[in-house]
Amino acid sequence: MAGIRTIEVDCSPDTDDPEIDGPARHFTFIINGVPVFARGANLVPQSMLPGSVTPQQDHDLVRACRDANMTMVRVWGGGVYASDAFMTACDEYGILVWHDFMFACIDYPGDDEEFMSEVRTEADYQTRRLANHPSLALWAGGNEVQAMHQAVWNNLNPGPWGSEIFDEVLPEAVRRNSPTVNYWANSPATDVDTDPRVNGTRAGDRHAWEVWHGADVGAGTHEDYSSPAEAMHYHRYSYDTGRFISEFGIH
């Protein structure tokens, strides 16, 4: 199956923003020049034994996404890479794919050359394998690695925690093997000049776990609510001003 399309991510300043502490930034997928609202879900492994998932199951899952009026699926970085059958079904049904590399929630030994060699090999293989799927809209460096590092260390300074992976190794693999596909350093990630918080509301994508935890993870503290129950109420989603909520934290 062939597909001719352009996919861009608009991260330009939001001129309609009230400019509190400077303008926020858009995070919008532009398909063939047309902004597309991303409606979808995160894909976690369908089975504890990934090899048991059949091509027909992948096809049926993507068809269900289409029937649910989804436009995008995010392949979550704490699971497994999408199969060829899954990606082909996304091509067939017109479902865009945000695909994390398989790194999640912890620091990685960027100073271990044997490990880094494995990372380069994996990134090269996966970007080549999936390069020809028109549904592939974006590669993200991983899931919550930057967010967790910032939460613990209060910075994103370069160092042997994996920064080289997300800032150099992975984007180089995408540029080399899949140059028409967008790259985003992590999920969530930010434009630090606009919003230094990795999981903030003014730039980039964010993971909205406030409802699950009833606590602040970037969109306001529980003290803004009259009770813990109110802080965890699903109505809280309607107050979230995140630019692009790529994970809602409800299973």
Per-region residue spans from a language model:
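Substrate-binding/catalytic cleft of secreted carbohydrate-active enzymes
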Residues: 72-92, 96-251
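Active-site-adjacent substrate/metal-binding segments within catalytic domains
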Residues: 1-106, 115-138
